[in-house]
């Protein structure tokens, strides 16, 4: 079996909903980290890239018709370089990286760009067609996140709980208290604030320049979503999203965000040919399915399955990047895995509650952040995992070279 190496990884800042990146189209946003990879790796013959695999969860607006291909062309890759778009909802870009690794390990490719993009601010409203002439049954759906154009049969079979409702379901089923969720969210904000203060994320972010009608361009160089001023007292005052007395709030859930990330993955031959530095090896990946109504718990079985598959243990993981869709589901997973609520290996620089969660880009962000953390700490293994809407989980392990 051949090896698949991560040689570079970069991302945009993650923008707040209707924030600094809201003016940037999804395809333009997706092009930015690809263009950064091109600039950062001048020794590569970019016409020889075997594929671009990009994740995107929406694809209902400016990210339609294969946004991976659009972003690749906009970034300046030669037309000979193919591209595709993957949709495993929140896990899309982590899946893209896994797909790239499998192709390289199988000897079918030597150089692949994998990543993802999401502009949740620019997600459109869409309206279906009438089933008959002069019909009045059309519905307008908001595509920002969650269900749309629901199939009645699927609703009858599994229900179509909203994402916050699935988190409430997890909290109730696994006994995750509101106070613990708020503490987890507070820790995420504090860790992110500390990392930002140290300039930790600067090495993984390519600034985004946004032209203005008048005056100088605006440059977005840092993540917009973190709230360093968050307090436990402030979190405790927030009302539930699903119901006033509920435990899931806007403060202990991830954000609605914009962003993109890209990872350059190479074979042994490509590393040697282009004199690249292999930074990490992609060891293994897996996916699982569970009941959609508790989708947030899916990382737990995904991680267990992957560790068995890779013949590794959780104790061997030096970094664990667990996407914080909601504090409730993150805690349900860590507790099921036997981890302490404040385990220093879990999201050591904060997670999606603080940094944000632009769906199709988040998985590649996890890998990028985990890679940098391994290099900074001298660790060997990093585990990245995410829950996925409609009841799936995904996990991937990398090893620092």
Swiss-Prot record:
Catalytic activity: succinyl-CoA + acetyl-CoA = 3-oxoadipyl-CoA + CoA
InterPro entries the record matches: PcaF, Thiolase, Thiolase-like, Thiolase_acyl_enz_int_AS, Thiolase_AS, Thiolase_C, Thiolase_CS, Thiolase_N
Keywords tagged on the record: Acyltransferase, Aromatic hydrocarbons catabolism, Transferase
Gene3D superfamilies for the chain: 3.40.47.10
Pfam families associated with the record: Thiolase_C, Thiolase_N
Active site positions: 90, 357, 387
Coiled coil: none
A Gene Ontology BP annotation from the UniProt entry: beta-ketoadipate pathway
E.C. designation(s): 2.3.1.174
Name of the protein in its database record: Beta-ketoadipyl-CoA thiolase
Protein species of origin: Acinetobacter baylyi (strain ATCC 33305 / BD413 / ADP1)
Record gene name: catF
């Amino acid at each position: 079996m051949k090896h698949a190496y991560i040689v570079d990884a970069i991302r945009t800042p993650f923008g707040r909903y209707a924030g600094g990146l809201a003016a940037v189209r999804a395809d333009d946003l997706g092009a930015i980290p690809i263009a950064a990879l091109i600039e950062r790796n001048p020794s590569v013959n970019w016409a020889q890239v075997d594929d671009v695999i990009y994740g995107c969860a929406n694809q209902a607006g400016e990210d339609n018709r294969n946004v991976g291909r659009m972003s690749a062309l906009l970034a300046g890759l030669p037309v000979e370089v193919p591209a595709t778009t993957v949709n495993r909802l929140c896990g899309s870009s982590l899946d893209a990286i896994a797909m790239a690794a499998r192709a390289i390990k199988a000897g079918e490719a030597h150089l692949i760009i994998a990543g993802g993009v999401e502009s949740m601010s620019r997600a459109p409203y869409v309206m279906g067609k009438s089933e008959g002439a002069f019909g009045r049954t059309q519905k307008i759906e908001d595509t920002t996140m969650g269900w749309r154009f629901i199939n009645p049969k699927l609703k009858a079979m599994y229900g179509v709980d909203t994402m916050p409702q699935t988190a409430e379901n997890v909290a109730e089923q696994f006994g995750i208290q509101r106070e613990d969720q708020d503490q987890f969210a507070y820790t995420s904000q504090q860790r992110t604030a500390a990392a930002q203060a140290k300039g930790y994320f600067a090495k993984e972010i390519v600034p985004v320049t946004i032209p203005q009608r008048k005056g100088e361009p605006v440059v977005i160089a840092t993540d917009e979503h973190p709230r360093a001023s968050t307090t436990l007292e402030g979190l405790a005052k927030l009302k539930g999203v699903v119901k006033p007395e509920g435990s899931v709030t806007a403060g202990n859930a991830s954000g609605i965000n914009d962003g993109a990330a890209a990872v350059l993955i190479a074979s042994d031959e490509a590393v040697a040919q282009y004199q690249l530095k292999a930074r990490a090896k992609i060891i293994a990946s897996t996916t699982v399915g569970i009941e959609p109504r508790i989708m947030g718990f899916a990382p737990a079985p995904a991680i267990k399955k992957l560790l068995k598959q890779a013949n590794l243990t959780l104790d061997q993981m030096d970094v664990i990047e667990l996407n914080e869709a909601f504090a409730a589901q993150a805690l349900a997973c860590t507790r099921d895995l036997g981890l302490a609520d404040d385990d220093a290996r879990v999201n050591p620089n904060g997670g999606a509650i603080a940094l944000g969660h632009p769906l199709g880009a988040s998985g590649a962000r996890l890998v990028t952040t985990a890679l940098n953390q391994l290099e900074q700490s001298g660790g060997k293994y990093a585990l990245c995992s995410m829950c996925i809407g409609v009841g799936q989980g995904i996990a991937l392990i990398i090893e620092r070279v």
